[in-house]
């Protein structure tokens, strides 16, 4: 399996240039709020809580931006 040079084994591709930096900043801010030290020694439960919160906030942000728009 080919590796994405920016995200290790991730097959996700960001569509917006510079989004990786914003997502990383959000990840570390949320980890700090939750008292999680991100790294290889962190449990998957702790890492997962950070990832879940990122998803929750991104969905909320998208819903706010899309409110009132019809497709």
Swiss-Prot record:
Residue(s) at site: Cleavage: 29-30
- Keywords tagged on the record: DNA-binding, Sporulation
Pfam families per the UniProt record, alphabetical: SASP
Task: Name the Gene Ontology biological process terms.
Answer: DNA topological change; sporulation resulting in formation of a cellular spore
Enumerate the GO terms in the molecular function aspect: double-stranded DNA binding
Does the record's keyword annotation contain DNA-binding? Answer: yes
Alphabetized InterPro entries for the sequence: SASP_alpha/beta-type, SASP_alpha/beta-type_CS, SASP_DNA-binding, SASP_sf_alpha/beta
| Alphabetized Gene3D superfamilies for the sequence | Small, acid-soluble spore protein, alpha/beta type-like (6.10.10.80)
* Family as reported in the entry's similarity comment: Belongs to the alpha/beta-type SASP family.
Report further notes: SASP are degraded in the first minutes of spore germination and provide amino acids for both new protein synthesis and metabolism.
Summarizing the function annotation, the protein's role is: SASP are bound to spore DNA. They are double-stranded DNA-binding proteins that cause DNA to change to an a-like conformation. They protect the DNA backbone from chemical and enzymatic cleavage and are thus involved in dormant spore's high resistance to UV light.
Q: What is this protein called?
A: Small, acid-soluble spore protein 2
